[in-house]
Regions:
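Conserved catalytic or metal-liganding residues and their short signature motifs at active sites
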Residues: 2-222
């Protein structure tokens, strides 16, 4: 009977020791993981910035962009996380905002899985299509040449109830929000939609009383 009791105590003691060892190993692993991940959590962006990812870019190009717009340490840690996660950067496309105070871990998630950011596009005192194309080309991925081509395309203009000669009338000076990789055709379509909303029945009737069409009002005002 005594031997049985001692045997049970030994088994219980052995179980407790094994349990303690497992807990110790788990604790060590957790501490190690925390030590490894801590720099990625503590490293933060020092200012708001936007990272542009062109279609078909490379990890090297993205790293250079991060270094240019943040700092070497932040860029290095974000890049490390992206590589470890297996990100295929060539499939990402757009402009991604990294806010001041955002950790390297959060920034990596934004670049890998986050939604692209819309860019505010404000213009006024634009008197020619060339000026508009210049501003749009400086703000978005398509070039000035791409915008000029769309503005001069009869088919593009016809879909917007205009011609290359009067397409400038839909470009109402205001603030808009578009994605960086928007096509010239889609941007013009969105601006045309705003133009239609602006020229509601009330404004159209006021123009009519003056003997003018909406486009003629725009031309006179410019």
């Amino acid at each position: 009977m005594a031997k049985t009791t001692k045997s049970r105590k030994k088994k219980k003691s052995s179980f407790v020791d094994k349990h303690k060892r497992v807990l110790l190993i788990v604790a060590v692993v957790l501490v190690a993981m925390a030590a490894v991940s801590l720099p990625f959590v503590l490293t933060k962006a020092s200012a708001d910035t936007i990272i542009y990812i062109p279609k078909g870019t490379t990890m090297e190009a993205l790293t250079d962009s991060l270094k240019k717009n943040t700092d070497d340490t932040f860029a290095s840690r974000v890049t490390t996380l992206l590589k470890v996660s297996g990100m295929k950067v060539e499939y990402r496309h757009g402009a991604f905002k990294i806010a001041k105070g955002e950790t390297a871990l959060m920034a990596a998630y934004t670049l890998r899985r986050g939604e692209p950011s819309e860019l505010k596009f404000t213009f006024n005192n634009v008197r020619t299509l060339d000026e508009f194309a210049t501003r749009a080309g400086n703000k978005f991925e398509p070039s000035k040449k791409d915008f000029l081509k769309a503005l001069a395309d009869p088919e593009v203009c016809a879909k917007l109830d205009h011609t290359p000669d009067n397409i400038g009338c839909i470009l109402l000076a205001d603030s808009y929000k578009f994605y960086w990789d928007i096509t010239p055709e889609k941007l013009l379509k969105n601006m045309y939609n705003y133009y239609v909303q602006f020229w509601n029945d009330e404004r159209t009737q006021k123009a009519k009383k003056l003997g003018l069409t909406p486009d003629e009002v725009v031309i006179v005002a410019s």
